[in-house]
């Protein structure tokens, strides 16, 4: 951390979950836009620039990036199926966004206007979806930005995928 003196570490000794950490951390944010990613994702070089550009429209309250699955092997059914699912999901988000607004954002990569963030219950599941949907309920759109993408490895096998989801 000494390489980034401008970084602020918000240590919390008790484990309270991701949603509690988001609620707490947002109280320290000073910028007008907040970009969220998962720790296990790799962003494309232009992702941040592209996602911020989408906020030029004042009606946009949230921008959803694209999730991509890196398939390591063609015979890996788990990651292959996951990759197909996310391509389908991305197509739906792109079409919804062109029509009016995407429905929800995936936690791998999305951004919100800071003033639209509302604390969530700490037992919230799918915090990314709930946060983006609340913003849409306030009359803002969720833009989909395929040129801002996050890539993550797929599951090694079906057992690993089941552990992640259950």
Specify the residue positions occupied by each region the protein language model found:
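Conserved donor nucleotide-binding strand/loop of the catalytic core
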Residues: 1-28, 66, 79-82, 86, ...
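Short aromatic/hydrophobic "clamp" motif used to bind/position activated sugar donors
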Residues: 34
């Amino acid at each position: 951390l000494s390489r980034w003196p401008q970084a602020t570490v918000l240590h919390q000794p008790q484990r309270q979950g991701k949603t509690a950490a988001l609620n707490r951390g947002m109280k320290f944010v000073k910028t007008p836009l907040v970009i969220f990613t998962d720790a296990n994702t790799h962003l494309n070089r232009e992702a941040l620039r592209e996602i911020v550009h989408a906020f030029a429209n004042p009606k946009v309250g949230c921008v959803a990036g694209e999730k991509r699955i890196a398939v390591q092997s063609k015979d890996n059914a788990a990651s292959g199926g996951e990759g197909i699912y996310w391509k389908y999901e991305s197509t739906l988000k792109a079409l919804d966004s062109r029509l009016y607004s995407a429905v929800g954002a995936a936690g791998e990569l999305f951004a919100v206007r800071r003033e639209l963030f509302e604390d969530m219950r700490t037992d919230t599941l799918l915090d990314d979806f709930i946060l983006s949907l609340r913003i849409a309920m306030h009359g803002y759109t969720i833009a989909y930005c395929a040129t801002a993408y996050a890539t993550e490895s797929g599951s090694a096998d079906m057992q690993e995928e089941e552990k992640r989801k259950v």
